[in-house]
């Protein structure tokens, strides 16, 4: 660890902390995700999955894993330092075209699903933006590769406000559509700067969803009233937030709409 000069604590979670640091060899700022290792249990399964998934991903809109440092007591994942969380960047750049960021977010999610990865915790706090406007999906601690068939999965994934109704109702066998629901919530929030379903409990969250998105018609009316956006954006949001996951739009279908209306990634 002598290569890195530790700086400020950026965030913390169940297994460890994330620090700002300086790479003394490159002189660049990096982010260090440090995970404490238990003598009896060893490396947490979430860390193993995160490393395995990140190693196979390579995309402009996905955070890259620079290196791993492993000692008896500590596992450190080294990432590029990304300047802003999504909402802070949008707040600082209100005059800029939000659709450019929406496009990048969709491109990142489409790539993940093409690589058989379900993120399972898409939310604004896990989406970062560089100072020159490049969006990066981050924090793959809850992610799963569907190439490894190990259902049932936990339904206690995805932060409450972005959790799909089937997860709220306890589903343990699910696929990419749980990310698509989160994507719809995030796109809405990127445009309005307000969460669509700010529930206080699982029960309250389901009540909010049923009230606002119980049918496509009611949801479309609400979105059209609140958002001054092109029709295709409304269509993407509404179809992402279909209560019936079997009817929910896929990342491939969203990309088709984008390519026709906005341009490819």
Swiss-Prot record:
PANTHER family referenced in this protein's UniProt entry, alphabetically: CELL DIVISION PROTEIN KINASE
Catalytic activity: L-seryl-[protein] + ATP = O-phospho-L-seryl-[protein] + ADP + H(+); L-threonyl-[protein] + ATP = O-phospho-L-threonyl-[protein] + ADP + H(+)
Highest taxon listed in the record's lineage: Eukaryota
Residues at the catalytic site: 121 (proton acceptor)
Keywords associated with the record: ATP-binding, Cell cycle, Cell division, Kinase, Mitosis, Nucleotide-binding, Nucleus, Serine/threonine-protein kinase, Transferase
UniProt-recorded name of the protein: Probable cell division protein kinase ECU08_0230
Keyword Zinc recorded: no
Family membership: Belongs to the protein kinase superfamily. CMGC Ser/Thr protein kinase family. CDC2/CDKX subfamily.
Record-linked SUPFAM superfamilies: Protein kinase-like (PK-like)
GO CC terms, sorted: nucleus
EC category: transferase
EC number(s) from the headed UniProt entry: 2.7.11.22
GO BP: cell division
Cellular localisation: Nucleus
Record function comment: May play a role in the control of the eukaryotic cell cycle.
Main localization category: nucleus
């Amino acid at each position: 660890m002598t290569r890195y000069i530790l700086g400020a604590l950026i965030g913390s979670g169940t297994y460890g902390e994330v620090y700002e640091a300086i790479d003394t060899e490159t002189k660049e700022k990096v982010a260090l995700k440090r995970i404490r290792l238990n003598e009896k249990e060893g490396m947490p399964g979430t860390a193993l999955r995160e490393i395995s998934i990140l190693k196979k991903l390579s995309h402009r809109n996905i955070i890259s894993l620079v290196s791993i440092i492993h000692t008896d007591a500590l596992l450190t994942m080294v990432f590029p330092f990304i300047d802003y969380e999504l909402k802070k960047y949008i707040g600082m750049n209100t005059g800029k075209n939000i659709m450019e960021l929406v496009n990048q977010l969709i491109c990142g999610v489409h790539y993940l699903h093409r690589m058989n990865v379900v993120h399972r915790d898409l939310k604004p706090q896990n989406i970062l933006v560089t100072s020159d406007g490049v969006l990066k999906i981050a924090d793959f601690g809850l992610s799963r590769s569907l190439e490894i068939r190990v259902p049932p999965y936990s339904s206690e994934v995805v932060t409450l406000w972005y959790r799909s109704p089937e997860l709220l109702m306890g589903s343990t066998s699910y696929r990419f559509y749980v990310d698509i629901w989160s994507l719809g919530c995030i796109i809405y929030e990127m445009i309005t700067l307000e969460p669509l379903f700010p529930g206080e409990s699982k029960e309250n969250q389901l009540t909010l969803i049923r009230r606002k998105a119980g049918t496509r018609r009611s949801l479309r009316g609400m979105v059209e009233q609140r958002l001054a956006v092109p029709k295709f954006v409304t269509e993407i949001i509404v179809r992402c937030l279909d209560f019936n996951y079997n009817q929910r739009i896929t990342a491939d279908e969203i990309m088709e709409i984008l390519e026709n209306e906005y341009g490819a990634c």
